[in-house]
Amino acid sequence: LGHAYSALLAYDMAMAEGGEFLLRIEDIDKSRARPAWEAQIYKDLEWLGLWWPKPVMRQSDRLSVYQERLQNLWKRQYLFSCTCSRRDVQEAASAPQEGAAPLVGPDGILYPGTCRENRSFAIGPTLPTDAALRLWMERAATMAGEIHENGKVISFTETGRGPNGETGLIAFTAEEVIQTIGDVVLARRDMGTSYHLSVVLDDAAQGVTHVVRGEDLFEATKIHVILQRLLRLPTPIYHHHRLIRDENGKRLAKRDDARALSKYRAEGATPNDIRRLVGLPVA
């Protein structure tokens, strides 16, 4: 239901503005990409009455584009290589000398800077293939602020609401994202890219003007805006929406099969029934 709500809301907003609803297959993580799952996406969206331009953009076809932009950021010393595993990050951030419980950002526990301290930046003309690549947030956010037309304040326009009701012009500083987001991974060792980098480049390539997505991605938008500044790409208008939750207030997860659209459909539900369930106007 959560994905249905997001897709229906985006579709309704696009139609109201005379725009296009775009579908993109984000399949860079092969452990979560299956032909059967992709086919189910098409089936569900078509059943809901949604239409989109074809062929759809597929991220797995654009790996060379992501590598090219990573190379650009690497040469400009916005990236550093990192060999830390998730366990390494958790243990370092939870070490006794760190004091309080580790801070958590959009990608989980904030990276404590282990490999950054080694200053493993642009050494050699090619990207390292034996390590992840992290964004050096201090340098990146500082430069993004200088590039921005309003001085050192970085901003984007929000027409929905963040998790704490944030709306309108959302402004933030380099100091804020250094402390609350940190050095995020831009290229995983096993896939050569990341969600953050890929969606920024894909949105620009598709000419996306409005991004509609869940409020759980609100903080990640700050990462995306910084990348847009560094790569000289346009910043869309963002609309973050509420999350669909169960009767106990728990967010519905992808694995919550009990609320899969196919089951509602098999039980005789109509697309307008789904709209009513998620609180959207019927078509």
Language model feature labels by segment:
Residues 1-100, 215-233, 248:
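N-terminal Rossmann-like or analogous alpha/beta NTP/dinucleotide-binding catalytic cores
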Residues 88-253, 260-265:
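Active-site cores that bind ATP or allylic diphosphates and position pyrophosphate for catalysis
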Residues 266-282:
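Extended, charge-rich low-complexity interaction segments
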Residues 62-67, 240-243, 251-254, 277-283:
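Noncatalytic linker/hinge segments flanking ATPase motor cores
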